Design a protein with these regions (language model features):
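Active-site-proximal structural scaffolding
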Residues: 113, 145, 215, 254-260, ...
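Short, charged, low-complexity amphipathic alpha-helix
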Residues: 196-263, 361, 365-377
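Short amphipathic alpha-helical segments and their helix-coil junctions
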Residues: 17-30, 130, 138, 200-207, ...
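Alpha-helix N-cap/helix-initiation motif
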Residues: 31, 35, 140-142, 250
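Mg2+/Mn2+-dependent nuclease catalytic core
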Residues: 95-204
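Metal-dependent nuclease catalytic cores that hydrolyze phosphodiester bonds in DNA/RNA
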Residues: 1-128, 168-170, 182, 261
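Hydrophobic/aromatic-lined pockets within catalytic cores
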Residues: 50-54, 135-138, 153-161, 204-207, ...
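Extended, charge-rich alpha-helical segments
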Residues: 266-377
Length: 377
């Protein structure tokens, strides 16, 4: 993957909304995560699968992938198949489409020292298609006005626009673990206008560490999220509602709290984790100490435990059906659907409040049920 730029495409959603956060994050250690490591492995496998499918020599990375499993294999194969489908469509309009894999894309014309890596770049008949693989399953990622994808597209235009006279840019997110394929298409002219009027001036502020701090859902990916003063100010302002009983709040106030309460909870948890790690490292917080958390009993040696129980005349094991996820990993998705598809059902989920922008359909509430019953009568 290489080194990341200060104003990387992957972090652009954050620094475009909060320009000073880019420089602020330089003061913090760059800690990796299991999710990032898993994503890196998945990208390596995707690259290999796609190269192999295109007849490009590639060394199988599987034995060196710490997070490799059956699911990752299926996801990477699906990604390669999807790109081949795009290529087949491209060949209907041009005889020689261009396919580039893990292409370095330089967008420094608009962003100081800006560069990134495009998973797949496809060019055919005046159309540029950027495909980005996402292995995460926590948050569904949309390609619509996605700044990371738009930066990649700008980098690709710098290389190929003069050669191929590109007038249309399509950006695609392929996120198999969320069954999500999101596509956004924009004219080259519109993309370049955004680059000049929005991206370039904001990037200049971000590179200098200037501009205004702004809190939002992008804070979750900021290194300074735990002790950022602006985030604290915004969340403490919301916490003031705690001094009034909920029945005394107006509907508008409740709606305002609902829109921000997840950020408040996230911020509070970030503060607790930051303070704990600092205390473990030796920092003293007035009125606080590091205590031992709850723990559960465990066997020191399961093999010896089993032998002892068997010797006492008892069976130490339970026979239990594999869960759906483990069963699918064991059988593989195709066989799982073929053998067990008719035995699988998904009950209705527990009601939860979500914004109207959420893609899930609204559930029937007691009021809706009552209204429907009256209509039927």
């Amino acid at each position: 993957m290489g080194n990341h730029a200060l104003l990387s495409a992957s972090s652009s959603h954050r620094w475009l909304n909060c320009p000073p956060s880019a420089r602020l994050g330089e003061n913090y250690e760059d800690k990796g995560s299991d999710f990032a490591a898993e994503g890196t492995d998945a990208h390596s496998l995707c690259e290999h699968k796609l190269k192999t499918a295109l007849g490009i020599p590639s060394e199988d990375p599987t034995e060196n992938l710490s997070w490799y499993n059956e699911e990752m294999e299926e996801c990477a194969s699906g990604y390669a198949t999807y790109v081949l489908e795009l290529l087949a469509e491209a060949k209907k309009v041009t005889t020689d489409p261009i396919v580039l894999i893990e292409q370095r894309l330089d967008y420094s014309k608009y962003v100081e020292s800006g560069f990134g890596t495009g998973d797949c770049v496809l060019i055919a008949d005046g159309t540029l298609n950027i495909v980005d693989y996402k292995h995460g399953k926590g948050v569904e990622v949309s390609a619509d006005h996605n700044p990371q994808m738009m930066l990649y597209a700008l980098g690709a235009l710098e290389i190929f626009d003069a050669l191929y006279d590109i007038d249309t840019v399509t950006m695609t997110i392929y996120q198999p673990r969320r069954s999500n394929v999101s596509t956004y298409t924009v004219s080259t002219a519109e993309l370049l206008e955004w680059a000049e009027t929005v991206l370039k001036p904001t990037a200049e502020l971000a590179f200098k560490g200037e501009g205004e701090f702004h809190c939002g859902e992008w804070c979750q990916f900021c290194k300074a999220k735990a002790d950022c003063r602006e985030r604290a100010r915004a969340n403490l302002a919301l916490a003031a509602y705690d001094f009034a009983e909920p029945p005394l709040l107006t509907d508008e106030e409740v709606e305002e709290v609902l829109a921000k309460v997840d950020d408040l909870v996230s911020w509070a948890n970030d503060i607790k984790e930051y303070a704990l790690q600092a205390a473990i490292s030796g920092k003293a917080w007035n009125g606080w100490k590091v205590g031992e958390g709850r723990s559960n009993r465990k066997y020191t040696d399961e093999r010896l435990v089993a032998a002892a129980v068997i010797a006492a005349g008892h069976d130490p094991y339970e026979q239990k059906l594999l869960g759906i996820t483990e069963m699918q990993k064991t059988l593989g998705k195709v066989k799982f659907d073929e053998i067990l598809g008719r035995f699988i059902t998904k009950p209705q989920g527990k009601p939860t409040l979500v914004p109207m922008s959420d893609k899930r359909p609204a559930m029937n509430t007691a009021k809706n049920d009552f209204m429907e019953e009256n209509i039927d009568e």
